[in-house]
């Protein structure tokens, strides 16, 4: 049995509600990265065998709300690094999963973007997270089409 961590976004909001912007949980990577790492550690210390990177909102649909699309690779990289550091600091054997989120709203298959737009975004997520993660998780995807975009990106990277 593997126990996965819980919500990162809700924990961030509970601990520091002053940082809420259109970037959602990505804002904390900019303004409070130590808090992101602390939450990963808290989940590990609570018994999680697997933690998920804080990359759910490090995608253009969120970043564009604050004109921060250019920060995408940097934020993804930082999110992976913080998760891996939390595992190393814990000195426990914990799996790090790279979050590959839906690229528009969760649970809205009608909003899934086309492959030509989606695959490069997933390629960036995968490339930046690969040094830090053990596995990838297609998080809250609402259609097979979204997962196929991830599979296409993975096949192009050859990891």
Residue ranges of each PLM-predicted region?
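Conserved small/polar residues in nucleotide/adenosyl-binding loops
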Residues: 157-159
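Glycine-rich, proline-tolerant flexible connector loops at the mouths of alpha/beta enzymes
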Residues: 24-31, 44-46, 50-75, 135-147
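Active-site beta->alpha loop and helix N-cap motifs at the rims of alpha/beta catalytic domains
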Residues: 50, 72-76, 80-128
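Non-catalytic positions within long, well-ordered alpha-helices that form the structural scaffold/packing
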Residues: 44, 129-130
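N-terminal small/glycine-rich loop or linker at the start of catalytic domains
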Residues: 1-31, 56-63, 92-117
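Conserved, mostly hydrophobic/aromatic
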Residues: 6, 43, 83, 136
